[in-house]
């Protein structure tokens, strides 16, 4: 199904405003992405290119870059999130449960939401059987945590025209792949509606640090610039601001202080709270029922 068939165009200033409960002006949506990079394939991303520029397998340097995030960066971010009393949405490749069980146990012990991010970091277009991979991913996370994921992020936010129907069939209630609005939107599928929550590419460590290659302090300055605009607009309608972190990027020593300062300053404003994706979804569904 083409995206135009799944939702109608809706200018934001012509919709009835969404409202948060009394006392809440803006919701911060913190996300922590945990991935598995298979050394037998090209890496999902590169921090360093090989001599002569031709990628080789196995790509040990770039695999090690990501592996540092799981061995060190995650634990640094975990301490920061605990210190700030933030419960993020953890979007994870299901294979992380098998390869890094201590990481997922730490997330479960903190009560953090686990959201499915496929089995490992392979674009949905490359899968032989999307339906099987989606169900396998959800089954592993449910078996490991005791809870079936309600949300989904595709690897690299990838989808085919059929992916959303497979996700709805598997019981997924919300996605973060459709980065097209400041508010949640309801998408049609062949089975049941799925809600696209307002994710973004702008306050995202891969975009800022790995692709645009900004200095480390841009993690702070851009987040605050984004926040100031949304906080001002939130006087008229509910606003949600996502911040996406990956351990191999946000969890390194020269960035962690800037990430922490952004969270501290944003959450220090009156009426700002941090919610995970499931809580945002429940709020939105309740709003929709009242309309």
Residue ranges and their predicted role:
Residues 2-195, 220-243, 249-291:
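Catalytic alpha-helical scaffold of carbohydrate-active enzymes acting on polysaccharides/glycoconjugates
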Residues 197-229:
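A conserved mid-domain beta-alpha-beta active-site/ligand-binding segment of alpha/beta enzyme cores
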């Amino acid at each position: 199904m083409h995206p135009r068939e799944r939702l109608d165009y809706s200018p934001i200033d012509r919709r009835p405003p969404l409202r948060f409960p009394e006392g809440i002006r803006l919701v911060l949506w913190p996300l922590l992405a945990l991935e598995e990079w298979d050394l037998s394939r090209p890496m999902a991303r590169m921090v360093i290119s090989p001599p002569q520029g031709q990628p080789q397998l196995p790509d040990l340097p770039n695999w090690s870059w990501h592996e540092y995030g799981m061995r060190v960066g995650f634990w640094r971010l975990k301490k920061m999130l605990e210190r700030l009393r933030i419960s993020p949405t953890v979007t994870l490749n299901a294979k992380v449960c098998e390869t890094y069980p201590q990481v997922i146990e730490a997330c479960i012990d903190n009560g953090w939401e686990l959201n499915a991010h496929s089995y490992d970091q392979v674009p949905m277009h490359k899968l032989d059987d999307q339906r099987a991979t989606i169900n396998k991913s959800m089954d592993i996370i449910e078996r490991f945590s005791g809870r079936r994921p309600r949300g989904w992020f595709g690897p690299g936010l990838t989808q085919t025209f059929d992916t959303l129907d497979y996700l709805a069939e598997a019981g997924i209630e919300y996605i973060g792949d459709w980065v097209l609005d400041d508010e949640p939107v309801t998408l049609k599928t062949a089975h049941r509606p799925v809600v696209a929550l307002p994710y973004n590419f702008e306050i995202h460590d891969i975009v800022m640090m790995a692709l645009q290659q900004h200095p480390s302090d841009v993690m702070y300055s851009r987040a605050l610039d984004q926040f100031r605009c949304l906080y001002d607009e939130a006087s008229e309608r509910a606003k949600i601001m996502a911040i996406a972190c990956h351990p191999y990027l946000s969890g390194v020593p020269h960035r962690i202080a800037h990430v922490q300062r952004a969270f501290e300053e944003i959450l220090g404003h009156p009426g700002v709270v941090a919610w995970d994706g499931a809580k945002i979804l429940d709020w939105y569904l309740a709003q929709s029922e009242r309309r």
